[in-house]
Amino acid sequence: MVRFQRRKLLASCLCVTATVFLMVTLQVVVELGKFERKKLKDSNVQDGHRDVEGEPKHLEPFPEKEALALAGRTKVDAGSYPIVLWWSPLTGETGRLGQCGADACFFTINRTFQHHPMTRAFLFYGTDFNIDSLPLPREAHHDWALFHEESPKNNYKLFHKPVITLFNHTATFSRHSHLPLTTQYLEGVDVLKSLRYLVPLQAKNNLRQKLAPLVYVQSDCDPPSDRDSYVRELMAYIEVDSYGECLQNRDLPQQLKNPASMDADAFYRVIAQYKFILAFENAVCDDYITEKFWRPLKLGVVPVYYGSPTIADWLPSNRSAILVSEFSHPRELASFIRRLDYDDGLYETYVEWKLKGKISNQRLLTALNEREWGVQDINQDNYIDSFECMVCRRVWANSRLQEQGLPPKQWKADVSHLHCPEPALFTFSSPASPALRGRSLRELWLPSFQQSKKEAQALRWLVDRNQNFSSEEFWALVFKD
């Protein structure tokens, strides 16, 4: 009976807490909405754009005690919180008062808050960043922040100096970003050390009677890295089992053909049987490292890696992967892999770190230990929450500097925050499907990258002009002689 009463009391407390929190958030939304409607009614419109005059409203000091007691307040003064507006509707949140340590900000995708005097930052998702609609004119107190963890092929113009330097804050795959996402596909040290999927070497040797030494699983064919051209050439010198749509010569079980199954336990079991995995990225960029690299390491398979030129900085140990860049031709790579395939002692030097659970790379350990977000970890913020809070805390930090009569700190991205060279084409003397090799790269990726330079310059000029512009105006600049 006592236990039941305790549960009933606990449930009541939880309900009260939830109700109070909803009232707090609702009040913020209502207050902001009232202000915005009044602003729309009273403002003057000139040339189709709002005429915003006067100094932005200063943020009132937000002491830690008040921040920590936020959830217990029944009414929130909307004027006390900076607004952080997602210009890309990534989160889908129409309004949320988010707590970031001792600070709090109002996060929203509602573009009607663009000209609110408490709006301090605009957040952009790289893949969705386009010229069709930008928050212009840009006020002096408006920071721009970029979140881009995906492939550069999704939006090449971001990788050029005129565009990347438009942003004050960044969260990208580069270690030089303000919030590095380099290890975004790695849950932690434990999964690297885990032997859950490891197939003993003797069993792998027995499986070699029906399996190739190498496995390749890709369904995004002919990307900017031109990986399929390399693998096609490699196949002329060594057996490769290819399960994906690209260069396919072997079928996965029917239940594993859906791309969603790539993280399924059954798929891991199939791939873990191989000695080597061709881990080729779709683009060659510093620190752009995806699950293609981390997956074989988790499974106890040796990755044969092509992608980030800086990959050596992220290896668990010096001998944990075979780097394609160290071989002048696929023929040499094939010869080396065959040598490891026949020599158990030499092969085991590449999995020794896994068997002993010893990661010697301090850079990797430090990055995992110090990152402010987690991967599939309910006890940590995800990287989007961390990105939002980084911007929120910086907004408040500058507010406190201004309260002290000091100039605000100026943050600015540079080219190291997103660095990708021009796509390069593999050229081989042997005629391995010459009609197909590099076709899409020649016809699409190189011209796309080259045009993106012109797009970046045109966009920068228009943004610096600080007026809204049409797509016709933008493209006229891009193709101007």
Swiss-Prot record:
The keyword Endoplasmic reticulum applies. It is found in: Endoplasmic reticulum membrane. Keywords: Disulfide bond, Endoplasmic reticulum, Glycoprotein, Glycosyltransferase, Membrane, Signal-anchor, Transferase, Transmembrane, Transmembrane helix. GO terms for biological process: cerebral cortex radially oriented cell migration; N-glycan fucosylation; neuroblast migration; neuronal stem cell division; neuronal stem cell population maintenance; oligosaccharide biosynthetic process; positive regulation of protein secretion. It catalyses: L-threonyl-[protein] + GDP-beta-L-fucose = 3-O-(alpha-L-fucosyl)-L-threonyl-[protein] + GDP + H(+); L-seryl-[protein] + GDP-beta-L-fucose = 3-O-(alpha-L-fucosyl)-L-seryl-[protein] + GDP + H(+). The chain crosses the membrane at residues 9-31. It comes from the Eukaryota. It is a single-pass type II membrane protein. Its EC number is 2.4.1.221, 2.4.1.-. Widely expressed, with a higher expression in liver and thymus. Residues 32-481 are lumenal. Its main location: endoplasmic reticulum. Glycans are attached at N110, N168, N318, N468. Disulfide bonds join C389-C392. Belongs to the glycosyltransferase 10 family. Protein O-fucosyltransferase that specifically catalyzes O-fucosylation of serine or threonine residues in EMI domains of target proteins, such as MMRN1, MMRN2 and EMID1. Attaches fucose through an O-glycosidic linkage. O-fucosylation of EMI domain-containing proteins may be required for facilitating protein folding and secretion. May also show alpha-(1,3)-fucosyltransferase activity toward the innermost N-acetyl glucosamine (GlcNAc) residue in biantennary N-glycan acceptors. However, this was tested with a library of synthetic substrates and this activity is unsure in vivo. This is GDP-fucose protein O-fucosyltransferase 3. It comes from Mus musculus. The lineage of its organism: Eukaryota, Metazoa, Chordata, Craniata, Vertebrata.
